Amino acid sequence: MKKLLIAALVMLILGLGGYLIYDQLGGNRPVELSLEAKSPDTLSGQTFRGTPVDKGLEQLFQKIQTTQKLHPGAKLHTIYYTEPAGKLDTLEVFAGINLPFGAPDLELKEFSEGRYILAKVTGNKWVMPSPETIKEKIQDYAKANKLTLSGYYIDKIVSETEVHVIAPVR
């Protein structure tokens, strides 16, 4: 009986400790949703079509990060048109930075939508909500506010602990 009580106490302490760590990393922070009355930033970047293990994907992100270093304040943005289910499935992704003008070898992506839903997500990457969870929250927000989404999502990497998900509204 005494061993059972000690085991239960140890489990309680471990569970409480785990929860406190999870909370400290930002696991309980809510996703902040708002409607922005402006177009998403114009992006300069490139579209990649291939598999996640393709060297071209890594090279694309290296190229964009190199361009980003030349433009302080520019943030990495990604748009996944086709998300892979596995390592060998095809994906189509646009990677770019918020530049209002083109750069050599980069395509300019401008958005015609005049509004978008902004989801601000903060916390450690290990405890952030999944992309599916964020998309569900955005869709629920759009439905509650009688908004029609354009059907794609722009991920803006603000920092290692903050991501903005932009969902243009028709």
Regions found by a protein language model. Give the residues of each.
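A solvent-exposed interaction/effector surface
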Residues: K2-R170
